[in-house]
Curated annotation (Swiss-Prot):
This is Proline--tRNA ligase. It is found in: Cytoplasm. Its main location: cytoplasm. Belongs to the class-II aminoacyl-tRNA synthetase family. ProS type 3 subfamily. GO terms for cellular component: aminoacyl-tRNA synthetase multienzyme complex; cytoplasm. SUPFAM superfamilies: C-terminal domain of ProRS (SSF64586), Class II aaRS ABD-related (SSF52954), Class II aaRS and biotin synthetases (SSF55681). Keywords: Aminoacyl-tRNA synthetase, ATP-binding, Cytoplasm, Ligase, Nucleotide-binding, Protein biosynthesis.
Length: 474
């Protein structure tokens, strides 16, 4: 495919840089003729594949993967009133089969509670069937009216991982909420994406949920990106869909449920947070290729360089490190540019001098360059890969936390969210919360366990130790 050789705009203009990079690095093609619907380039899809395989491996420890229908009959979708209130203006409808109008309109799943839970009713009979922990990775459809953007706000969400669990008691479901949060923490840590977990305010929780825990990360423009959510659903859906089980005493009880979702926003976060003016910077767990080997040949006789490259590639692959040799007939500099644009974590340069010293030149994507001996090469490279992932995460976390600031007044908060997040005391009343959102023109992300403090609610003046985070959001 034709590589776009255009240079990137500066990352200081994040939105322009982000859009240009998605095309130049061949992640997603935004030219599909439906708003909010985009096309994966094969390279972008290789990132998705790597990232979602990692997510599957984490889930498959104690979940089972399955697949539910995309089409949902209107009566099923409308059953849970709070849920449908939250989604009715986002649902796409299928009204015809060929030339004939359908008797019952069918919704394209915006999320799959209303497709799955009628089946859970049929599948769950006794406490022995619990806990039931299933997930699927599917496309979902939401008629988003806010600004659509590839990987961030799509109308066809192409990589929607949704897990749906059922438990005997509210506490068991609460335990599952925490297990899901631990799994998400591990997943985002492996992607070197820092996050703060906020409990969403009552008025912004998932429609039909008891409460919502959200994983929020900060994009370079200071806006928050909700990259994952975990919802405690209590018995609301169980009562609506009559999902009951027979307990040990033979009595019928409603199940308690949770659901938790991650979409391709996790990839938007990796690209946005770690990328630089030369292109993508991919943590090893997000990149199909971890090391590209570049032969440095000056004259006809390559002095054994080609052979050495082959040996290094085989050595690394034998140790589960994905290495490729770029032996195209191109100047090394042109190769560096190409692989840096694609965000490959490491480059190994091998020239006659390296052969003589029995070493290779290891260049880390962020520029760190060092000569390492051939002896123990795979072990050294593996350690360097892990070091890179840790350095990326620490740098991103430090930069995010440096931009979260405790503010005394709403004016100060308004100023602060121009380029970061503000935290302020909040009495917990919805009226005050909504007034804070209006005054600062932002979203209240909610309260975070990790953010402590005390003060007076800026609206009603009541003393409180509840601290809330405010941010501009995607
Ligand atoms: N239009 C969208 N484009 C891309 N990602 C989205 C979009 N809408 C939501 N998401 C992502 O999908 C995650 C789950 O969506 S959700 O509405 O919060 N939760 C659910 O749908 C629940 N059924 C859990 S799967 C969100 O946390 C967000 O990261």
């Amino acid at each position: 495919m034709e590589e776009e050789s255009k240079s990137l705009p500066s990352k200081d203009n994040f939105s322009e840089w982000y859009n240009e990079l998605l095309m130049t690095a061949q992640i997603m093609d935004v030219r599909y003729p439906i708003k909010g619907v985009y096309v994966w380039y094969p390279f972008g899809f290789s990132i998705r594949k790597k990232v979602y395989n990692m997510l599957r491996n984490l889930l498959d420890v104690d979940h089972q993967e399955t697949y539910f229908p995309m089409l949902i009959p209107k009566p099923e979708l409308l059953k849970e009133s709070e849920h449908i209130k939250g989604f009715e203006d986002e649902v796409y409808w299928v009204t015809h089969g060929g030339l004939s109008e359908l008797e019952v309109p069918l919704a394209l799943r915006p999320t799959s509670e209303t497709a799955i839970y009628p089946m859970y009713k049929l599948w769950i009979r006794s406490h022995a069937d619990l806990p039931l922990k299933l997930y699927q990775i599917v496309n979902t459809f939401r008629y988003e009216t806010k600004h659509t953007r590839p990987l961030i706000r799509l109308r066809e969400i192409t990589s929607f991982k949704e897990a749906h669990t059922a438990h005997a008691t509210w506490d068991d479901a609460e335990k599952q909420v925490h297990e899901a949060m631990d799994l998400y923490s591990e997943f985002f840590t492996k992607l070197a994406v820092p996050f703060i977990v906020h409990k969403r305010p009552e008025w912004d929780k998932f429609p039909g949920a008891d409460y919502t825990m959200a994983f929020d990360t900060m994009m370079p423009d200071g806006k928050s990106l909700q990259v994952g959510t975990v919802h405690h659903l209590g018995t609301k859906f169980a009562k609506t869909y009559d999902i009951t089980y027979e307990d040990e005493k033979g009595e019928r009880q409603y199940v308690n449920q949770t659901c938790y979702g991650i979409s391709e926003r996790c990839i938007a976060a990796v690209i946005g947070i770690h990328g630089d003016n030369k292109g993508l910077v991919l943590p090893p767990n997000a990149s199909q290729t971890q090391v590209v080997i570049i032969p440095i040949i000056f004259k006809k006789d390559d002095g054994g360089v080609k052979e050495a490259c082959q040996k290094v590639k085989e050595l690394l692959r034998a140790n589960d490190i994905v290495a490729v040799i770029d032996d195209a007939d191109e100047r090394p500099g042109a190769k560096y540019y190409k692989w840096e644009m694609k965000g490959t974590p490491f480059r190994i340069e091998i020239g006659p001098r390296d052969i003589k010293n029995n070493s290779v030149m290891l260049v880390r994507r962020d520029g760190k360059k060092e000569s390492i001996p051939m002896d123990g090469l795979p072990e050294t490279v593996r350690n360097k890969l892990f070091e890179f992932q840790t350095d990326l995460l620490n740098a991103a976390r430090d930069s995010m936390l440096a931009r979260v600031k405790a503010c005394e007044t709403l004016d100060e908060a308004k100023q602060q969210i121009e380029n970061g997040w503000a935290t302020m005391p909040w009495c917990g009343e919805k009226a005050c919360g909504l007034e804070m959102e209006n005054a600062v023109n932002c979203k209240l992300l909610g309260e975070a366990h990790t953010i402590k403090g005390a003060g007076k609610c800026p609206i009603c003046g009541k003393a409180t130790d509840r601290i809330i985070t405010m941010a501009r959001s995607y």
